[in-house]
A protein has these predicted regions:
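Conserved micro-motifs of the catalytic ATP-binding
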Residues: 4-9, 47-50
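Short conserved segment of the HATPase_c
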Residues: 98-112
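Short helix-loop "hinge" at the ATP-lid/N-box region of the Bergerat-fold HATPase_c
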Residues: 66-67
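Conserved glycine-rich
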Residues: 139-140
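Short beta-strand/loop element within the Bergerat-fold HATPase_c
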Residues: 73-85
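Short alpha-helical Gxxx[C/S/T] motif in the catalytic ATP-binding
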Residues: 122, 127, 131
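Conserved catalytic submotifs in the C-terminal HATPase_c
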Residues: 10-13, 32, 37-46
Length: 164
Protein backbone atom coordinates (compact mmCIF):
# COMPACT_ATOMS: atom_id res chain seq x y z
CA UNK A 1 0.00 0.00 0.00
CA UNK A 2 1.12 3.54 -0.70
CA UNK A 3 2.62 5.27 2.34
CA UNK A 4 3.13 9.02 2.27
CA UNK A 5 5.87 8.78 4.89
CA UNK A 6 8.07 7.01 2.32
CA UNK A 7 8.69 10.27 0.44
CA UNK A 8 12.39 11.12 0.54
CA UNK A 9 13.60 14.54 -0.58
CA UNK A 10 16.63 15.13 -2.78
CA UNK A 11 16.96 18.89 -2.31
CA UNK A 12 19.07 21.42 -4.12
CA UNK A 13 18.98 25.09 -5.12
CA UNK A 14 15.87 25.65 -7.20
CA UNK A 15 14.60 28.55 -9.31
CA UNK A 16 10.89 28.30 -8.52
CA UNK A 17 10.02 31.05 -11.01
CA UNK A 18 11.43 29.04 -13.89
CA UNK A 19 9.77 25.83 -12.68
CA UNK A 20 6.29 27.40 -12.48
CA UNK A 21 6.65 29.02 -15.92
CA UNK A 22 7.76 25.69 -17.38
CA UNK A 23 4.84 23.74 -15.87
CA UNK A 24 2.36 26.33 -17.17
CA UNK A 25 3.96 26.08 -20.65
CA UNK A 26 3.80 22.26 -20.58
CA UNK A 27 0.05 22.40 -19.92
CA UNK A 28 -0.63 24.89 -22.74
CA UNK A 29 -2.19 22.25 -25.05
CA UNK A 30 -4.57 21.07 -22.31
CA UNK A 31 -5.55 24.66 -21.53
CA UNK A 32 -6.17 25.44 -25.21
CA UNK A 33 -8.22 22.27 -25.69
CA UNK A 34 -10.52 23.32 -22.82
CA UNK A 35 -10.69 26.95 -24.01
CA UNK A 36 -8.88 28.18 -20.89
CA UNK A 37 -6.11 30.68 -20.48
CA UNK A 38 -3.41 30.83 -17.84
CA UNK A 39 -2.52 34.18 -16.28
CA UNK A 40 0.97 33.91 -14.82
CA UNK A 41 2.23 36.58 -12.40
CA UNK A 42 5.51 35.34 -10.98
CA UNK A 43 8.28 37.41 -9.43
CA UNK A 44 11.65 36.86 -11.12
CA UNK A 45 14.20 34.54 -9.53
CA UNK A 46 12.29 33.09 -6.60
CA UNK A 47 14.93 30.78 -5.16
CA UNK A 48 14.29 27.98 -2.70
CA UNK A 49 16.19 24.96 -1.41
CA UNK A 50 14.02 22.03 -2.37
CA UNK A 51 13.46 18.84 -4.32
CA UNK A 52 12.71 19.94 -7.90
CA UNK A 53 10.96 16.71 -8.95
CA UNK A 54 8.72 16.54 -5.88
CA UNK A 55 7.76 20.22 -5.99
CA UNK A 56 7.08 19.98 -9.74
CA UNK A 57 4.67 17.15 -8.89
CA UNK A 58 2.89 19.41 -6.36
CA UNK A 59 2.42 22.32 -8.77
CA UNK A 60 1.57 20.07 -11.72
CA UNK A 61 -1.14 18.47 -9.56
CA UNK A 62 -2.53 21.84 -8.46
CA UNK A 63 -2.62 23.11 -12.04
CA UNK A 64 -4.26 19.94 -13.36
CA UNK A 65 -6.90 20.18 -10.62
CA UNK A 66 -7.49 23.83 -11.52
CA UNK A 67 -7.91 22.86 -15.18
CA UNK A 68 -10.28 20.00 -14.30
CA UNK A 69 -12.55 22.17 -12.16
CA UNK A 70 -12.32 25.48 -14.04
CA UNK A 71 -15.38 26.90 -15.76
CA UNK A 72 -14.98 26.72 -19.54
CA UNK A 73 -13.65 29.87 -21.15
CA UNK A 74 -12.19 31.30 -17.94
CA UNK A 75 -8.65 31.73 -16.63
CA UNK A 76 -6.40 29.88 -14.27
CA UNK A 77 -4.21 32.22 -12.27
CA UNK A 78 -0.71 31.40 -11.03
CA UNK A 79 0.89 33.96 -8.75
CA UNK A 80 4.17 33.69 -6.89
CA UNK A 81 5.87 36.34 -4.81
CA UNK A 82 8.34 36.60 -1.96
CA UNK A 83 7.24 38.11 1.34
CA UNK A 84 9.01 38.06 4.70
CA UNK A 85 11.50 35.28 3.82
CA UNK A 86 8.68 33.15 2.42
CA UNK A 87 7.46 32.49 -1.08
CA UNK A 88 3.71 32.36 -1.56
CA UNK A 89 2.38 30.52 -4.59
CA UNK A 90 -1.32 30.78 -5.47
CA UNK A 91 -3.04 28.58 -8.04
CA UNK A 92 -6.60 29.78 -8.60
CA UNK A 93 -9.45 28.81 -10.88
CA UNK A 94 -12.91 30.15 -11.53
CA UNK A 95 -15.47 27.45 -10.93
CA UNK A 96 -17.76 25.73 -8.50
CA UNK A 97 -17.17 26.53 -4.83
CA UNK A 98 -15.74 23.88 -2.50
CA UNK A 99 -17.97 23.85 0.60
CA UNK A 100 -16.30 25.41 3.66
CA UNK A 101 -16.53 22.20 5.71
CA UNK A 102 -14.62 20.27 3.02
CA UNK A 103 -11.69 22.65 2.53
CA UNK A 104 -9.37 21.00 5.08
CA UNK A 105 -10.59 17.45 4.37
CA UNK A 106 -9.49 17.63 0.72
CA UNK A 107 -5.88 17.13 1.86
CA UNK A 108 -6.69 13.75 3.47
CA UNK A 109 -5.80 10.50 1.68
CA UNK A 110 -8.53 9.21 -0.64
CA UNK A 111 -10.84 12.17 0.10
CA UNK A 112 -13.00 13.36 -2.79
CA UNK A 113 -15.35 16.30 -2.79
CA UNK A 114 -18.90 15.02 -3.39
CA UNK A 115 -21.19 16.13 -6.14
CA UNK A 116 -20.31 17.60 -9.48
CA UNK A 117 -16.66 18.38 -8.67
CA UNK A 118 -15.72 14.71 -8.29
CA UNK A 119 -17.67 13.55 -11.33
CA UNK A 120 -15.39 15.50 -13.69
CA UNK A 121 -12.19 13.61 -12.85
CA UNK A 122 -11.26 10.04 -12.16
CA UNK A 123 -8.46 10.44 -9.63
CA UNK A 124 -8.00 8.28 -6.57
CA UNK A 125 -7.96 11.18 -4.14
CA UNK A 126 -4.22 10.95 -3.40
CA UNK A 127 -2.93 13.99 -5.29
CA UNK A 128 -3.62 16.64 -2.65
CA UNK A 129 -2.56 14.36 0.22
CA UNK A 130 0.77 13.79 -1.52
CA UNK A 131 1.08 17.51 -2.30
CA UNK A 132 0.52 18.36 1.38
CA UNK A 133 3.12 15.83 2.52
CA UNK A 134 5.72 17.16 0.05
CA UNK A 135 5.06 20.79 0.98
CA UNK A 136 5.31 20.01 4.70
CA UNK A 137 8.59 18.11 4.16
CA UNK A 138 9.87 21.41 2.70
CA UNK A 139 8.80 23.19 5.95
CA UNK A 140 5.94 24.84 4.09
CA UNK A 141 2.16 24.95 4.26
CA UNK A 142 -0.68 24.38 1.82
CA UNK A 143 -4.28 25.44 2.23
CA UNK A 144 -7.38 25.96 0.13
CA UNK A 145 -9.85 28.83 0.02
CA UNK A 146 -13.05 28.89 -2.00
CA UNK A 147 -15.81 31.42 -2.59
CA UNK A 148 -18.54 32.03 -5.17
CA UNK A 149 -16.01 33.17 -7.78
CA UNK A 150 -12.91 31.07 -7.43
CA UNK A 151 -11.00 28.37 -5.61
CA UNK A 152 -7.44 29.12 -4.51
CA UNK A 153 -4.69 26.78 -3.38
CA UNK A 154 -2.01 28.67 -1.47
CA UNK A 155 1.41 27.12 -0.93
CA UNK A 156 3.94 28.88 1.29
CA UNK A 157 7.59 27.79 1.24
CA UNK A 158 10.68 29.20 2.94
CA UNK A 159 12.69 31.43 0.61
CA UNK A 160 16.38 30.79 0.20
CA UNK A 161 18.45 33.38 2.06
CA UNK A 162 21.44 35.15 0.55
CA UNK A 163 24.51 32.96 0.84
CA UNK A 164 22.61 29.68 1.27
Amino acid sequence: MFNLQDIVLEPGNLDLSMMLEQIADELYAVLKEKNLRCDVQIDDTLMIYGDADKLARVFDNLLRNAIAYCDKGTAIRIQAKERHQEIEIVVANEGEKIPEEELSAIFEKFYRVDGSRSSKTGGAGLGLAIAKEIVELHHGTIRAESDEWETRFIVTLPAMSEGE
